[in-house]
């Protein structure tokens, strides 16, 4: 089973290293140092903590699973610069077009040349050969990055499994709130591990609504996938995150689900 074989390492924010079948996959690369301010016409993001390792310490990456390219807490400047060194960047269809065409984000410089980005629509699946002779399937899953009706750009999640296997897949939620799209993932897939983006991100321009899952919503995900291990991501390191480690521990304890949590160990570079 893929969940028994996969090794997950935490790097920071929504950045995690997944080692499976000889492949090294990286989610939402963010490697800029602490203290960075990212100013757009609509808002400013403030990064508070550094990544566990810097981009040059991570080693070779085969593929990047990028939930979206247009927010700097999911793809920052240093993360952008490593994208042309990987075999493919799997992301939204809109994001793939921007990256392949070197289109700049608002207030940012263009993407580097040489990126091979693949757009993945909701429920579409691509196949990637592993280095041990198997086939890894990656399926796009829906996300809603905040309250209904807002235009915050497309975001995708992912379900990973080996071809011909249907049990105990890995679900990477991406930046989403709890809504019917997440529930549909539960109807379509048997999941054994959830990399769950939490943080209850909030920005003044949006008002009191949250842009990513609250801890309370994440508990709904844990109950939806009743036997899955829950690995939190996207819960620390930014000023606009309103919930973090303490809230996760408190609410999961109150819900009787503390034993479902597994904190991914930080990645340590090989000597």
Task: Report residues per predicted region.
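Metallo-beta-lactamase
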Residues: 1-3, 90-167, 250-271
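Catalytic core of the metallo-beta-lactamase
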Residues: 4, 11-21, 127-192, 209, ...
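Divalent metal-coordination and catalytic microenvironments
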Residues: 18, 28, 68, 76, ...
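Metal-dependent catalytic neighborhoods of phosphoester/phosphodiester hydrolases
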Residues: 75-86, 101-104, 240-250
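Zn-dependent metallo-beta-lactamase
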Residues: 1-49, 247, 251, 259, ...
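Structural motif
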Residues: 23-25, 62-63, 88, 136, ...
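Pre-active-site segment of Zn-dependent metallo-hydrolases
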Residues: 23-66, 70, 77-82, 147-150, ...
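Cap/insert and terminal regions of metallo-dependent hydrolase folds
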Residues: 88, 94-97, 177-268
